[in-house]
Regions:
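C-terminal interaction modules of eukaryotic adaptor/scaffold proteins
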Residues: 649-745
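Leucine-rich repeat
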Residues: 124, 149, 183, 209, ...
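N-terminal adaptor-interaction module of cullin-RING ubiquitin ligase components
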Residues: 2-284, 288-296, 301, 305-309, ...
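Tandem repeat domain/solenoid detector
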Residues: 275, 298, 302-303, 314-318, ...
Length: 748
């Protein structure tokens, strides 16, 4: 009896406590307790979220945090440390040592390794990928790190100059034997852009990694001349590798020893020539490559490449030939005929290509990624013939299409591509300068609803009408044929139709303007016309009914007969590049610019964007993490205030050459932008010379680009520790927009 009374009393006290807490906090729980769902269901639900949303959801409660740390999700997260000191006695490493989490992927960028401690001894068993990029690390430190990484699958060492200057790296046979047992499962080795890499050092790396399938030596100083090889290897056998030079002849010996296991080779940014490729050709039939990367190889010619590809017809699925200037249509024709399983083909800036070679792409039925940007002799007709010419229906295999800066690409060709490539996820149309481009934009919004990445950089004819679809219905229906949508309507007949359809506004006939002689210059006339067009669009937006009335009206009357499609149809869009689209104004951001998944947005050099557009942007796109507003001269401190207050996930912000900004912008950022990692305020002449002094309250801010002028000096504040989503490696040529930030962080 006493026990039951105590239980009842405890229940009453718990109920009273919950009631007191509810009244105190003003929060009333209602509905099911989603935090108490089984872990399997939570993990299944979180699989439908992207990495950024999962990280934010993990901050809701402890149970959701545990769900986001499931092994399935951890495989795609990276712990990235940038411009910090690796010392286990101080933060951030001291904090990580007491963490209960595991870190399967580590990335160190410009990190100075002072005191490793027992960090890798504690977490090394779970580390699968590790990267060192421009780090200050010694040979003993690297050995002490690798000896604990028993689960390592991938090792990347990029531009670590001091490490390879030491010729004693892995010199001890006993240490190499220990590493060989520990690193037996390593499949990928990337030693990129290392100037002092030698044959001996490469031999030791390959010796301690017996299961290598990926070898990446891009950007290394490899000698392909036989005379130099004979100088350092005077003996005929040449068994002892040289400590002074890196030669392809010795690399080919290493490849021959592992030719049955190697599946990926990368010799990009080297002087590889036909003789070297013919040497690899002699390794058939045991050498069966899956991916081959030869980007920016100036000595590469069709003769050597054709000989090598002839031996890889059954297995090669990815071929990267960016900036191979000497490749011709004949080489592309052989690629299309002899590599039927090819899924990725990148031939950016291969200037000798034309429609004759592109038409042969029809033989690549499994092609998923195509990059022919800056191939200026390719036309829209050639692309259509190669991608959709012989297909009986839509091409549902292609996922990425890069056709940037094709001078002869017509709007009609873009429209046809959008109709026949419905499964595109990435569409790069940068540097398109033909008129009527807004018609192409409307068809992109209508047909490519699964896009996640859209690049319209420097497209001169991207306008508010194309972005919003206002008044674009007739043009979309006629595919841009102006003569097809201007019917002759009698005045009396139009009045009768208006009485029957009161929702349709009366359109007065256009009267020719009186004869006037303008004294404006062409630039002044263009400014006046842009202002009048913006005024008309703003008037249309202000007179629109609310959302419910607009939806009802669109059901009763087909709204697309007058208006087209807005960018809000691309609900899955995550990356949008509108750099230097000068005709865009606040109208595009005010009128239905709702992209809930958008993470990266560039409006650089869109000089007509002001605080009104920014106010609408930050409310309709709350997931933005990287925002570029460089040279948006109409922005002021109020715009930065809106950005800092409403974009809670903002990691990277570029305000370069925004001349109206003052120190008040820095104060707003310091107060609200708690997740900011990188800030660029170069050229903001009304700001103080040292903005880091005003941003000391942001402990996560690692990079500040300050200065009254565009200088290259970089100031660092705080330490850099980041968890970011893993991204597939890309070997494409450097993009033309502003440099990307070091990483896209998603969670702290």
């Amino acid at each position: 009896m006493a026990t039951s009374q105590s239980v009842v009393g405890r229940a009453k006290s718990d109920s009273a406590f919950r009631e007191y807490y509810r009244e105190l906090s003003g929060y009333d729980e209602f509905g099911p307790q989603y935090a108490d769902l089984p872990m399997e269901i939570l993990v299944k639900i979180f699989t439908y979220l992207n990495a950024s949303d999962r990280c934010v959801a993990g901050q809701t409660c402890q149970r959701w945090l545990e769900a986001t740390q499931h092994n399935h999700f951890q495989e795609h997260l990276w712990l990235a440390l940038h411009r910090t000191t690796f010392n286990t006695n101080v933060a951030p490493m001291a904090d990580l040592l007491v963490s209960s989490r595991t870190f399967p992927n580590l990335s160190f960028s410009e990190v100075d390794f002072e005191r490793v401690g027992n960090f890798f001894e504690q977490f090394g068993a779970t580390i699968q990928q590790i990267e060192f990029r421009a780090c200050e690390i010694q040979e003993r430190t690297l050995y002490n790190i690798l000896r604990h990484l028993s689960s390592l699958r991938s090792l990347t060492i990029h531009s670590c100059r001091d490490l390879f200057m030491c010729i004693r790296l892995f010199e001890d046979p006993a240490e190499r034997a220990e590493l060989k047992r520990t690193l037996a499962n390593v499949r990928e080795l990337r030693l990129t852009h290392n100037q002092y890499l030698s044959d001996a050092t490469l031999h030791r790396f390959c010796e301690v990694m017996p299961s290598l399938a990926v070898l990446d030596l891009s950007g290394c100083h490899i000698s392909f001349h036989k005379g130099l090889y004979k100088k350092f290897y005077p003996a005929s056998t040449g068994q002892q590798p040289s400590e002074s030079v890196l030669t392809f002849h010795y690399i080919s010996r290493l490849i021959e020893e592992r030719k049955q296991m190697l599946k990926v080779l990368n010799f990009s940014e080297t002087l590889i020539d036909d003789s070297a490729l013919e040497l690899l050709t002699g390794l058939q039939p045991d050498l069966r490559l899956v991916r081959l990367e030869l980007n920016q190889c100036e000595q590469l010619s069709p003769r050597g490449l054709e000989a090598l590809l002839h031996t890889q017809t059954d297995t090669l699925t990815q071929l990267h030939l960016t900036r191979a200037y000497r490749l011709t249509d004949t080489c592309l024709r052989q690629i299309c005929h002899e590599l039927p399983a090819l899924r990725v083909l990148r031939m950016r800036e291969c200037r000798a290509l034309s429609d004759q070679g592109v038409r042969e792409l029809a033989h690549l039925r499994a092609l998923e990624v195509l990059d022919v940007s800056y191939c200026r002799d390719i036309t829209g007709e050639g692309l259509l013939a190669g991608l959709v010419g012989q297909s009986q229906g839509p091409n549902c295999c292609l996922r990425e299409l890069h056709i940037r800066a094709l001078n002869h690409l017509s709007v009609h060709a873009i429209v046809e591509l959008t109709k026949w490539l419905p499964e595109l996820r990435l569409f790069d149309l940068g540097f398109h300068h033909q008129s009527m481009f807004e018609i192409a934009m409307q068809h992109i919004f209508h047909n490519l609803v699964r896009l996640t990445h859209l690049d319209l950089e420097h497209c001169d004819y991207v306008s508010d009408n194309g972005m919003t679809g206002i008044g674009m219905g007739p043009l979309v229906a006629s595919d841009g044929n102006k003569n097809a949508y201007v019917p002759h309507v009698d005045t009396n007949e139009r009045q009768d139709d208006t009485q029957d359809s009161p929702n349709v506004p009366v359109v007065e006939p256009i009267q020719p303007p009186p004869m006037r002689i303008s004294i404006r210059s062409r630039a002044e006339q263009q400014i006046v016309e842009e202002a009048e067009r913006k005024q008309r669009l703003m008037a249309f937006i202000n007179t629109r009914p609310n959302a419910a009335a607009a939806a009802k009206a669109s059901v009763e009357t087909d709204d697309h007969t007058t208006n087209g499609y807005s960018i809000s149809r691309l609900r899955q869009l995550r990356i949008l590049n509108l750099t230097r689209c000068n005709q865009l104004t606040d109208v595009s951001l005010l009128c239905d610019f709702r992209l809930p998944e958008l993470q990266q947005l560039s409006l650089a050099q869109c000089q007509q964007i002001s605080v009104e557009g920014i106010r609408a942007l930050v409310r309709n796109c709350p997931s933005i993490e990287q925002l570029d507003l460089s040279e948006c001269h109409s922005l002021n401190d109020r715009a930065v205030e809106q950005i800092a207050e409403h974009l809670r996930r903002l990691r990277t912000l570029s305000l370069r050459r925004c001349h109206q900004l003052t120190d008040f912008s820095l104060d707003y950022i310091a107060c609200h932008a708690r997740q900011l990692r990188m800030l660029d305020v170069r050229g903001c002449k009304h700001m103080c010379e040292d903005p880091a002094m005003r941003l000391v309250s942001l402990p996560l801010l690692t990079t500040i680009l300050p200065g009254l002028h565009d200088e290259n000096n970089v100031a660092s504040a705080g330490f850099g520790i980041t968890l970011m989503a893993s991204s597939p490696s890309s070997s494409a040529a450097p993009r033309r927009p502003i440099p990307r930030p070091p990483a896209m962080p998603l969670l702290i």
